[in-house]
Amino acid sequence: TRFRERHDIMNSKMRTGRAMILLMIILFLSDNICAQDAYIHRLGMEGRAGYIFPTSSFLRGENDMRKIMRSACSAHLKYSFRLPPGTAADRIYGSSYQGIGLGYFDFGNRREMGTPVALYAFQGARIAGITPRLSLNYEWGFGASFGWKPYDYLSNPNNTIMGSKVNAYLSAGIHLNWILSPRFDLNIGATAVHFSKGNTRYPNTGLNTIDFKIG
């Protein structure tokens, strides 16, 4: 019996030792993988010029300016990170990147709409490689926009598209990514944008644009 107990204790210690060795190997490999796949951080600027879809009477001319609202413009500051090009993880995930952005918008009617600011998260990846330096990418974003001048029965009765000072921001688009150098690249493409409160507050016809972007 004592021999069996000693034998069991020795087996238990051996299993514990093997588990510790295996754990050390896993941690060592994880550290190496993390060191090899350290993230690349990027800071970018982007300008957009857009067309406003006339989905409401307010946008079609029933506003204080008595004119159709067709154009929008915005400026964006964006931070993103990704895995180094050429690594196994980068190839698996299609050169994906993610980050946060800050956008400033002007729709040509500051008195009735304001000049909202959007804070959003975004993610993108390569759709297809055209040349070693040129690729077709997609990008989408989701966040919140602040600083709208919403509908008010007395002070802002024409604005039937926004019923709140804070509204959701959604975007999706494609662009060409041209790698100019290891530190700089150029993006040119189109982005569809939607602002609304998601029918949680009325009126809420929302605002939709299609933008040309460069950055």
What are these regions (language model features)?
Residues 86-88, 182-186:
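Repeated loop/turn-to-beta-strand initiation elements of outer-membrane beta-barrel proteins
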